[in-house]
A protein has these predicted regions:
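Conserved RNA-binding domains used in RNP assembly and mRNA/RNA metabolism
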Residues: 1-79
Length: 79
């Protein structure tokens, strides 16, 4: 698992388009999905086929498309 926040700079996140990613939110929920788009200036992540996973790894929510604003996410990982 590559920690993109501490690894490649934000302008390299676009290299992961189409990859399965894990986003840890500031409330420590983890959302897993396919990176569809990343807005560099606003650091907004767009995921498709996403799942919200709790601490035990159980899926609590899921959907086809979600936009996560930078103020909500804490870490971004390539799975």
């Amino acid at each position: 698992m590559v920690d993109i926040k501490k690894g490649p700079p934000p302008d390299k996140i676009m290299n992961y388009l189409g990859s399965r990613m894990e986003v840890e939110l500031k409330n420590h929920h983890k959302i897993v999905g396919i990176l569809a788009f990343y807005h560099l200036q606003e650091q907004t992540i767009h995921l498709t086929d996403w799942m919200d996973v709790d601490e035990k790894g159980q899926i609590t929510k899921s959907g086809s498309f979600i936009i996560i604003n930078r103020t909500a996410w804490f870490q971004l990982y390539n799975m």
